[in-house]
């Protein structure tokens, strides 16, 4: 469970909308949410937070390093809490579902490829676009 101290550590003032949005992102099973999905979840929880406020807060959270914004092809921005753990993504092109995965062999191979070309890996973002086999 995220705490108000997370907002303070990120240099943000503790406000009710920020707390509600941060708590919602932390408690939802859906780790990748658009601003519209955030609004829907907040409304379902009986919270009255406007769309403009959600966009503003998510942008502030991104700037403060609390969330990561992803702009997957063919869709709008989705946000996930920045928990510090590296992972890659698969995006179902038929449903827009985002699946997280981590594969040590893929990570190892990427470092090897970078080293073979005389570089050091600083960061990467791997997104696989997939659909269910028929």
UniProtKB/Swiss-Prot annotation:
GO MF: DNA-binding transcription factor activity; transcription cis-regulatory region binding; zinc ion binding
GO CC, alphabetical: cytosol
Residue ranges, annotated region (DNA-binding): 1-83
Region (Dimerization): 84-134
Residues given in the record as Zn(2+) binding sites: 32, 80, 89, 100
Protein localization: Cytoplasm
Residues the entry annotates as binding Fe cation: 86, 88, 107, 124
Keywords from the UniProt entry: Cytoplasm, DNA-binding, Iron, Metal-binding, Repressor, Transcription, Transcription regulation, Zinc
Primary location group: cytoplasm
Entry's Gene Ontology BP terms: negative regulation of DNA-templated transcription; negative regulation of siderophore biosynthetic process
Coiled-coil features, chain-numbered ranges: none
Annotated InterPro entries: FUR, Fur_C, WH-like_DNA-bd_sf, WH_DNA-bd_sf
Protein family per UniProt: Belongs to the Fur family.
Assembly behavior: Homodimer.
Purpose of the protein: Fur acts as a repressor, employing Fe(2+) as a cofactor to bind the operator of the iron transport operon. Involved in the siderophore pyoverdine (pseudobactin) 358 biosynthesis regulation.
Annotated protein name in UniProt: Ferric uptake regulation protein
């Amino acid at each position: 469970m995220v705490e108000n101290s997370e907002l303070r550590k990120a240099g943000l003032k503790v406000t009710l909308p920020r707390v509600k949005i941060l708590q919602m992102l932390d408690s939802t099973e859906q780790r990748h949410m658009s601003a519209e999905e955030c609004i829907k979840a907040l409304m379902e929880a009986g919270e009255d937070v406007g769309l403009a406020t959600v966009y503003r807060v998510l942008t502030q959270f991104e700037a403060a390093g609390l969330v990561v914004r992803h702009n997957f092809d063919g869709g709008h921005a989705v946000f996930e809490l920045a928990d510090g753990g590296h992972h890659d993504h698969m995006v179902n092109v038929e449903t827009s579902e985002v699946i997280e995965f981590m594969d040590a062999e893929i990570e190892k191979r990427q470092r090897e490829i970078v080293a073979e070309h005389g570089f050091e890996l600083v960061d990467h973002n791997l997104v696989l676009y997939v659909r269910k086999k028929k």
